[in-house]
Every structure is written in structure tokens, then in C-alpha cells.
Amino acid sequence: MIGYNIAKVHSYAWLNIPIFYYPIPKRPTLIAVSGRNQELTKSFAERFGYKRTYSDWRGLIRDPEVEVVDICTPPNVHSEPAIACCEAGKPMLCEKPLARDAEEAKEMLRAAEKAGVVNMTGFNYRFVPAVSYAKKLIDDGFVGRVLNFRGAYLNVEVGDWGYINPNFPLDWHFRAETAGHGAIGDLGSHIIDLSRYLVGEISSVAGATATFVKERPLVDKPTVKGKVEVEDAAVAAVKFANGALGTIEASWMAPGRKDFLRFEVTGNEGSIRFNLERINELEICSLKDPNDVRGFRDVWTTSKTHPMMEKFWVEQGAGFGWEHSFVNELNHFADCVMSNKPVTPVGASFYDGYRNCLIMDAIVESEKTDRWVTLEG
């Protein structure tokens, strides 16, 4: 494990795979974790049961007992460890966004393809049963020909009113060198991934971004302010290669929204919509229903017959939690590693991570040029 923040839920997932998916071919063993702050790294290792710690990720990758690497660092510490894993022949999962920009992501993709190692980008919402069921319904023709995708991820980050508070410190999220993008990388990348997963490839975008808080107190000098270098919010209109239209929105300045990831897919025969704040439900509408009862209805998606629930240990109808999406995600990754097979189409590969970065870069370019941007490929 490289990193110790979002790595908490990743570690929880690794530890719980044998519980939820028992019996399994091979039980994951938490060997080592690396982090810059040794006090926090050691505390993290003790909490989750890692055997040893490293202050440098290079030592962790060289460790002969480490067979698989999970990269859970800020975006500026994604490409080097990932490429080093490829050179060492070790499969890896890298948290989203895959990189700070598409150029960096492409280098990671090329290294993975050259090495032939199993690679995965951490888009965990693909592994929510309701989302997976939406994918199945769309593929089975429930909505007919897809016409529109509408997606938004809105929240107010943790803290004293979160990032909307101008006194929230200028941490790595607000610097282009470490984050690459702001809200669109942190939140919008999930919507971009779901749009591609559910509808198909995006061919062109027109975007707008805004930075509402221009300066913030420095982390180590609170009386001094520094410039915010990334966006607080972004919106984009998109065209899909199959002719569908879409909208994408991301903002970490949305009071009242805790973790509001929502998408709606409409077709010529029906519609599907999902809200992460109601994670177990999928709303569906079919034009085949009688007119007097036609409309959205809720489907509880945690029965054994629903995708991602076939081997889940919870009783039929019991609630599925956000953290469980990581259990499903990492179990899928582990299965692909042991079988030496690609993580796609269920999971997101480095190619998906690269395309995601390409779209984010295009949205920012569109804001700068005030033009539609056509995507390569």
C-alpha cells in the first residue's frame, strides 16, 4: 500500500474480501505500507495489521514479499510508482484520477501495456450494485436507444463548511502541481467514468470552469495566503460517439449536498436514474408500462439476483454501504490478478483512466478557448 488516507477504506476492503467472498482461492496479506510521515505511517500499519513500513515507495515496490501494489496517493505520486511497478512486473491498482493530465496518464498506460501487467484505475462506483444493475438494464435494451446522459457530483468537503470556507487551508487539492485538476478531478472524474461505462465513448466536449475562492491560507503559514490554482466547479456539455448527448457537473461547493453523485440515462423506451445518497436504490421508468401507472419507480438492488451481490454474504435485502464498493472492486482486481486477465469491461483499466484524463483536459481547454474540443480516437 502506498499512502494512508483513502488507503484506509482500501485496507478495510482487502481485509474483508475473505469475509464477504468466502471461500476464496488466496487470502490477501497486508505486507507493507509506505508514507512520507513515518509516525502516521506506523500508526496506519498498526491499525490495519501491515507487517512493515517504508518511508519511500521505491523500497516497498522492491520488497520481494509484495506481489501487488495499491497506489493511494495524491495524483502527483501516481505515475512514478505505477511505472516502477510495471518495470518490476507487479500488478497495480491506482486511485483516480489516474494522473494529473492525459500526457502523464498515457506514459503510465504505455508502461503497463509494454509490461503486460494487470492494471486498474480506482473507479469504485462501477462496483455499486445499483450502478452495475443500471449497466445491465441499459445493455439489455431497457431504455432503448440511449439519447441523453445527465450526471453531477456535488458536495461540500469535510471541515468547517469544507472547501466553500475561504479559510480552509491551501492543501494539495488546490495546487496544480499536486492535484492536476480540482473538483473535476476529485469528483467529476467519477461522472466521466460512469458516462463512458454506461453510454459509451465521448467524442467532443464544451466546458466551463470557475474558481470561486481565489486565495487560501498556507498550511504552514496561516497568516499568509497563496493562490488557488485549480477549479472549484466545472460543467460540460458532451457528445457521445453513438450520437447521444450529455451533461457533466462537478462542484465541491454545494451546501446541502453531502455526497450527491447522481446520473440519469434516458432512451427512446425508458429512463434510469441513480443517487449515491440513496445507494441501494435505482429508479427506473419504462414507456412499456400502462399510461396510468407510468413513471419512475424504485428498485431495491441488494437481492442475490442483482449484479455484484451474487456472492455477497449479507442477507437478501440488507443495505449495501459505500465501503462495500471497494470490497467488490478489490475482489475483482484480485481475481483478475490471479487469473491474469484484464479488469475490463467490469472494472476501469489504465486505458479508461487515460481517456478520463483526456476528457478532463479537454473541458479545461474548452474553458480557455471558448470552443468545442474534439477528442482524439
Q: What is each model feature region?
A:
Residues M1-F48:
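N-terminal Rossmann-like dinucleotide-binding module
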Residues Y22-P23, R52-E65:
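Short acidic low-complexity segments
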Residues V68, P74-F127, G141:
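Beta-strand-loop-alpha-helix segment that lines the small-molecule cofactor/substrate pocket
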Residues Y125-V228, L282, D370:
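Predominantly a Rossmann-like dinucleotide-binding segment in NAD(P)-dependent oxidoreductases
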Residues S189, E249-K258, A318-G321:
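Glycine-rich phosphate/pyrophosphate-binding beta-alpha loops
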